[in-house]
């Protein structure tokens, strides 16, 4: 229904997979608004909520953005996701390589209500599972 915090984060994750795929034309993304004091929201969703104590609540969107930030690369690796067309809009994938560390990351965002079992070919064949309505990063 799109009103759920997790639904929004999964949609953002699928969008970020597409952003990475088009990294040759997209130089930067941003998230706004970032901070919100509890009870004073002018816009929904915000990413980080706080109050007058030291209590901070990090949203699912924060966790999704963090996943992409911590597993960034400077080279996009062309990949193909073999799913029925009706399901592709609910799954995002992105493969990037970081030339400084030599690490290659596969990010999978699964907005489907079931676990995905994927066979990854190319940099060594391996099977991976991504739980329903979640995201995961794999080092290839």
Regions found by a protein language model. Give the residues of each.
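Short acidic, gly/pro-rich beta-turn/loop elements at beta-sheet edges
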Residues: 39, 75, 116-118, 128, ...
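Aromatic/acidic polysaccharide-binding cleft in carbohydrate-active enzymes
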Residues: 1-93
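Intrinsically disordered, low-complexity Pro/Gly/Ser/Thr-rich segments with frequent PxxP/GP/PP motifs
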Residues: 123-140
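Hydrophobic beta-strand residues in large extracellular and virion-surface proteins
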Residues: 48, 53, 106, 118-120, ...
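Active-site proximal loops enriched in glycine and acidic residues that flank catalytic Cys/His/Asp
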Residues: 30-33, 52, 80-81, 108-112, ...
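Short, glycine-/Ser/Thr-/acidic-enriched flexible segments
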Residues: 33-36, 55, 100-101, 110-114, ...
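Carbohydrate-binding surface patches
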Residues: 88-122
């Amino acid at each position: 229904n799109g009103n759920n915090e997790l639904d929004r984060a999964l949609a953002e994750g699928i969008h970020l997979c597409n952003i990475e795929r088009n990294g040759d034309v997209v130089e930067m993304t941003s998230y706004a608004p970032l901070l919100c004091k509890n009870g004073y929201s002018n816009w929904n969703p915000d990413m980080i909520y706080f109050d007058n104590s030291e209590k901070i609540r990090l949203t699912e969107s924060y966790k999704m953005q963090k996943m992409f930030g911590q597993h960034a690369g400077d080279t996009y690796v062309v990949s193909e996701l073999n799913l029925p067309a009706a399901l592709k809009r609910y799954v995002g994938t992105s493969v990037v390589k970081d030339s400084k560390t030599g690490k290659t990351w596969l990010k999978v965002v699964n907005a489907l209500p079931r676990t995905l079992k994927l066979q990854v070919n190319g940099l060594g064949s391996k099977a991976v599972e991504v739980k329903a309505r979640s995201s995961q990063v794999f080092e290839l």
